[in-house]
Regions:
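Single-residue recognition of alpha-helix boundary sites
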Residues: 14-15, 48, 78, 299
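Intrinsically disordered or highly flexible coil/loop and linker segments, enriched in small
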Residues: 15, 169-172, 280
Length: 315
């Protein structure tokens, strides 16, 4: 009787263990916090990223995903950062890469790296076409582990790099995609022009005006970052970026909407692939605020097991 009970228990317990070995995924609920950014901010509101950094540090992420193009995505690099691509490839041809030293340094903890290591890694990541990690190690080379005392007025210098240092991150994970950048910009611009005749241009103008008025008070109190991540603000940016404010659709507005959705779908695919592959439970994505609504919706369909969090969520 005891032997039968043991056999039954083994039959129940073994399949999950085998599954875990086959997939490589630990049985842990994974989550993603998405923080929307303002990109570069005016000097008058230079400290706007402070509340976002405080919020992100409190979350204590284990992996940081950023709005930069993956090094393997040559088409996006050509479309969006051609100068970086040309510089990277020219340096690679002229100098090559010391892969042995690079791999040795990747084994070390962030606190173990020396200033000359930061310089080497910045140069190496540049030659590898990795702008995200080039920017990170260039920041470390310039300001050290203590970081910049002065606000740099952008998400890299005031949010991403300080956050990465605080958790001891040695690598950022880029997930952006710009394969159809030119087509999207043309469609969006033509939609705006067509809106002057249909009256939709006034709708967009009203959305922008409402945003300008509502951001004044938060900006004065150093809370522009928090305002940007309110649900109402994110929804406005979503409507404008995807041309969903349009009441009389045309070929250009339809194209802009589709291209915007497709870009965010590809970003979501990149995120899903990396989050499933990595062992971390708590992940954070730092990306332009206009993407937040799109990505939350798409990820909810693509990766329903992933728990998605926003700053605006009720505690």
């Amino acid at each position: 009787m005891i032997r039968k009970i043991i056999v039954v228990l083994i039959a129940i317990l073994v399949p999950p263990a085998v599954y875990a070995q086959e997939t490589g995924e630990p049985h842990v609920s994974k989550e993603l916090l998405i923080i929307g950014t303002m990109h570069e901010v005016p000097s008058i509101v230079s400290r706007s990223y402070r509340p976002l950094l405080k919020f992100a540090k409190k979350y204590q992420p284990e992996a940081i995903f950023v709005e930069d193009i993956r090094p393997c995505d040559t088409l996006s690099l050509k479309n969006f950062t051609p100068r970086l691509l040309n510089t990277a490839d020219s340096l690679f041809r002229a100098e090559g890469i010391d892969e042995e030293r690079f791999l040795e340094l990747k084994k070390k903890q962030l606190a173990e790296l020396e200033p000359d290591d930061f310089a080497f890694l910045a140069n190496t990541y540049l030659k590898k076409r990795d702008r995200a990690n080039y920017s990170y190690y260039n920041y470390l080379k310039t300001y050290g582990m203590a970081g910049s005392k002065k606000a740099l007025r952008n998400e890299n210098g005031d949010l991403i790099c300080p956050l990465a240092i605080s958790i001891g991150a040695t690598e950022l994970i880029p997930v952006d995609d710009h394969k159809t950048e030119k087509e999207y910009q043309q469609a969006w611009s033509n939609t705006a022009k067509a809106g002057k005749e249909t009256g939709d241009a006034q709708i967009m103008a009203d959305l922008l005006k409402k945003d300008r008025h509502k951001r004044v008070w938060p900006s004065l109190w150093g809370k522009l970052g928090k305002y940007t991540n309110k649900q109402e603000t994110l929804q406005r940016f979503y409507l404008i970026n995807s041309c969903r404010y349009v009441t009389q659709p045309n070929e250009w507005s339809n194209a802009a909407r589709q291209l915007w959705d497709d870009r965010n779908y590809r970003i979501a695919e990149n995120l899903t692939e990396q989050i499933k592959k990595n062992p971390y439970q708590k992940n954070i994505l730092i990306i332009g605020a206009g993407h937040v609504i799109s990505l939350k919706t798409i990820l909810g369909q693509m990766y329903p097991e992933l728990k998605i969090k926003l700053m605006s969520d009720k505690k």
